[in-house]
Amino acid sequence: MNIVLKLSSNACQQLSEKYKSYEQTSKNPYIRFFAKVGKTSISVYTSGKVVFQGSDAEKIASEFGHVAQVVPKKQTNLIGTDEVGNGSYFGGLMVTASFVSDNHLKFLKEMGVADSKKLTDEKICQIAPKLIEEIPHVALVVEPEKYNEVIASGYNAVSIKVALHNQAIYLLEKQLGSQPESIVIDAFTTEANYKKYVSAEKNHPLTNVTLLTKAEDQFLAVAVSSIISRYKFLENLKKLSKESSFTLPSGAENLSDKVAAQIIKSQGIDALNHLAKLHFANTQKAMKIAQL
């Protein structure tokens, strides 16, 4: 468990005094107080940011204003979201929000729905079209060119995902015409970060949002979104490969650097804007390989 809070100077002082007997030395120059309480660490930064990490993080953080998230108890009548493509240099970013009701349970069991990372691409391509047809959802596909434009406008890799998850949920609520009992997002950032970035967005869902790690293992709606997003990503990568006449790999490993370098040599550096997320380190590595 990892919880981040922004506390006032007085609150940081109170925390430091309360847990002074647990204080330990930290080599990080930006940490002004560090303590280890059982299996939980408390790091107070000079900026006022406080990080609680460990099994009792939520309990200790609640003493300083953290409100514990209520984890939905039901599998159904909720919206779940997940994204794919954020870790891949080539291809766009896909975010899907899906709504699962009691009526969908039998169908999803028959389909063998699970987290997309546990399914082969072949299996995903088999079941995703059926999920798209049967399950109420909103899938947002951001092509690399649009992604690069948004990043250049001031968004970062986290805030763009917050915006997309938020918009997908908002649009799905409108599509349903009613509020789900709960909304679960497969956590890709801290709750504090999510709230900070989502406050800048124009539209907001009517239902409270819960961020959970490994939510795709706990909620079918998140697993469905994971599969649909993966399918959309694979389709997008296939389309871009055809347009570029190169087989574009998924991920951000050395192979991506080499393929990008080949594209630069044959089509020029500008061609990458249509195919890849330019702010990734792969761009500079590819330019070095291409000797630009």
From Swiss-Prot:
CDD domains: RNase_HII_bacteria_HIII_like (cd06590), RNAse_HIII_N (cd14796). Manganese or magnesium. Binds 1 divalent metal ion per monomer in the absence of substrate. May bind a second metal ion after substrate binding. InterPro entries: RNase_HII/HIII, RNase_HII/HIII_dom, RNase_HIII, RNase_HIII_N, RNaseH-like_sf, RNaseH_sf, TBP_dom_sf. One of its GO terms (cellular component) is ribonuclease H2 complex. It is an enzyme of class 3 (hydrolase). Its EC number is 3.1.26.4. Residues 76-292 form the RNase H type-2 domain. PROSITE patterns: RNASE_H_2 (PS51975). Keywords: Cytoplasm, Endonuclease, Hydrolase, Magnesium, Metal-binding, Nuclease. It comes from the Bacteria. Its main location: cytoplasm. It holds the Pfam family DUF3378. A divalent metal cation binds at residues 82-83, 186. It is found in: Cytoplasm. Its cofactor is Mn(2+); Mg(2+). Disulfide bonds: none annotated. GO terms for biological process: DNA replication, removal of RNA primer; mismatch repair. It catalyses: Endonucleolytic cleavage to 5'-phosphomonoester. Belongs to the RNase HII family. RnhC subfamily. Endonuclease that specifically degrades the RNA of RNA-DNA hybrids. This is Ribonuclease HIII. The lineage of its organism: Bacteria, Bacillati, Bacillota, Bacilli, Lactobacillales. The gene is rnhC.
